[in-house]
């Protein structure tokens, strides 16, 4: 059990899969269109939240009750995420089903940010929310606001290129200003 195999271990067969390693020798736990998925399971799990979103979207995915794990393959993980993002874009105020609309606004996944960062964003822009929002609600509110911020792209890119060419940033300017005061 110290990581080295002994002669006795080799007679007993291969070691059992560690319980903590997700997807080790396991296949996806989902049944798609009545057939069990045979792809290898990744580290994404089929949580209650994912299960709820799938049932709301009326997808033909179900969990196989005979398996003892909840890990899904990368294909189904990406499929579920893409369906979630497509539905969000289609539900936007201006129609959203034109191909131009999808190319104009890149999808930014703010769910990856920490709760403190989302709260700081909310405080900076003085967004009105109820107290006690959880991370998902906060990320949804912030992403709704983030998509509606007007940006002068030409000016922003010109400023960025200028700063890159001059090897300076606003932080450099602030530190130089404090040196001049001394």
From Swiss-Prot:
Domain notes: The zinc-finger domain mediates direct interaction with DNA and phosphoinositol phosphates (phosphoinositol 3-phosphate, phosphoinositol 4-phosphate and phosphoinositol 5-phosphate). In vitro oxydation causes reversible disulfide bond formation between Cys residues in the zinc-finger domain and reversible loss of zinc ion binding.
ZnF (Atypical) residues: 28-76
Keywords recorded for this protein, A-Z: Acetylation, Disulfide bond, DNA-binding, Isopeptide bond, Lipid-binding, Metal-binding, Nucleus, Phosphoprotein, Repressor, Transcription, Transcription regulation, Ubl conjugation, Zinc, Zinc-finger
N-acetylmethionine sites (modified residues): 1
SS bond list: 28-29, 37-73
Major localisation: nucleus
Record cross-link Glycyl lysine isopeptide (Lys-Gly) (interchain with G-Cter in SUMO2), residues: 48, 154, 165, 174
Lineage: Eukaryota, Metazoa, Chordata, Craniata, Vertebrata
Residue list for modification Phosphoserine: 92, 98
Family affiliation: Belongs to the SAP30 family.
A GO BP entry: positive regulation of stem cell population maintenance
Protein name, as recorded: Histone deacetylase complex subunit SAP30L
């Amino acid at each position: 059990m110290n990581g080295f195999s002994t002669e006795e271990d080799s007679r007993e067969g291969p070691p059992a899969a560690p319980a903590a390693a997700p997807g080790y020798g396991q296949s996806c736990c989902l049944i798609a269109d009545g057939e069990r998925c045979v792809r290898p399971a990744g580290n994404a799990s089929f949580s209650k939240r994912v299960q709820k979103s799938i049932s709301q979207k009326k997808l033909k995915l179900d969990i196989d009750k005979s398996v003892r794990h909840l890990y899904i393959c990368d294909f189904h993980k990406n499929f579920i995420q893409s369906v979630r993002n497509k539905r969000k874009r289609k539900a936007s105020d201006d129609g959203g089903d034109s191909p131009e609309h999808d190319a104009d606004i890149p999808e930014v996944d703010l769910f990856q940010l920490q709760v403190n960062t989302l709260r700081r964003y909310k405080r900076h822009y003085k967004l009105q929310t109820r107290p006690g929002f959880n991370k998902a609600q906060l990320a949804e509110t912030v992403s709704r606001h983030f998509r509606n911020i007007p940006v002068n792209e030409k000016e922003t890119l010109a400023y960025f290129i200028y700063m890159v060419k001059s090897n300076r940033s606003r932080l450099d300017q602030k530190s130089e200003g404090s040196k001049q005061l001394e």
